[in-house]
Amino acid sequence: MDSSTGPGNTSDCSDPLAQASCSPAPGSWLNLSHVDGNQSDPCGLNRTGLGGNDSLCPQTGSPSMVTAITIMALYSIVCVVGLFGNFLVMYVIVRYTKMKTATNIYIFNLALADALATSTLPFQSVNYLMGTWPFGTILCKIVISIDYYNMFTSIFTLCTMSVDRYIAVCHPVKALDFRTPRNAKIVNVCNWILSSAIGLPVMFMATTKYRQGSIDCTLTFSHPTWYWENLLKICVFIFAFIMPVLIITVCYGLMILRLKSVRMLSGSKEKDRNLRRITRMVLVVVAVFIVCWTPIHIYVIIKALITIPETTFQTVSWHFCIALGYTNSCLNPVLYAFLDENFKRCFREFCIPTSSTIEQQNSTRVRQNTREHPSTANTVDRTNHQLENLEAETAPLP
């Protein structure tokens, strides 16, 4: 027997035993249509998050224009800033050789996960405005799985970055062999494989359901629904929040003790300054992630344990938690621009290219063409050399 924990539940809204909110929404984790179905007041505001309709139940009517405009404006800002910022981060890391460090390889992975997450916002916006999911089952599966992949890959990558910082600060000798771009790429692949442990099952569980003339994108659970629903919530809370936060806390606790006890880490003031700067940047990124994601995780667990009455404060706080989760996907590029001089310089060169930058790009293209067409380059060199000799021979004598 299949059922959903989100708005895709086929039960009628008037049924007091309904397991989920009656309003449709895309099946993303932040929208929680598959994790956080409202079990206490199924006809209340859609608990599925920003992407769901405020109230499509018979008692409440259509969502207000102010709510719709506010949510759409927020979605648009997060989507544009998130996509542009994260793609710019990935471009800078790929484009500039000096940016291909182990830490930046992890940042690339984080930017990729955030870009994928923000790319789902247009679908969720359309779903919100139309009150139905018009994109079919395949896109439903993709959107839901992307949000799970983003959540797990992001926190796993931040965990990895914290461990990487710990090794760099507390074990600098071992760091020389371990902290390489090649190893960072391997670790990134492993993070995506680990995320597949939840991402792939969710993709198979995602489906579309018809309910009262509309289509819902939601997850289906085997009987008993309440057991599998709560099990998923608990697994997400433990493996995507509690355990990673504990690992991150231990790593930074040990780093702080090390930095306080040792005045010089590498024997060079310049290297120490860079080491502390990068450590500070990673710490800020991790802290912002935890601040943005803690409310939604706590909210989901509380609603799984107790019944929360529908009030204006509950509605506002729920939407605030959802907004924080999505906003995190567009904050990281801003943090890099303010906290890392290399990123700041590369961003500036991309947005406002100087003459030296253009000359450097042209010389890079020439070198690439020379490597790709060595015979042509040799011919041009010989021709130029012959012309120089000819000019020297035909030049008038003094």
From Swiss-Prot:
Phosphotyrosine modified-residue sites: Y166
Stored SUPFAM superfamilies: Family A G protein-coupled receptor-like
Post-translational modification (record): Phosphorylated. Differentially phosphorylated in basal and agonist-induced conditions. Agonist-mediated phosphorylation modulates receptor internalization. Phosphorylated by GRK2 in a agonist-dependent manner. Phosphorylation at Tyr-166 requires receptor activation, is dependent on non-receptor protein tyrosine kinase Src and results in a decrease in agonist efficacy by reducing G-protein coupling efficiency. Phosphorylated on tyrosine residues; the phosphorylation is involved in agonist-induced G-protein-independent receptor down-regulation.
GO biological process, one term: presynaptic modulation of chemical synaptic transmission
Gene3D superfamilies xrefs: Rhodopsin 7-helix transmembrane proteins
Keyword terms: Cell membrane, Cell projection, Disulfide bond, Endosome, G-protein coupled receptor, Glycoprotein, Lipoprotein, Membrane, Palmitate, Phosphoprotein, Receptor, Transducer, Transmembrane, Transmembrane helix, Ubl conjugation
Protein name: Mu-type opioid receptor
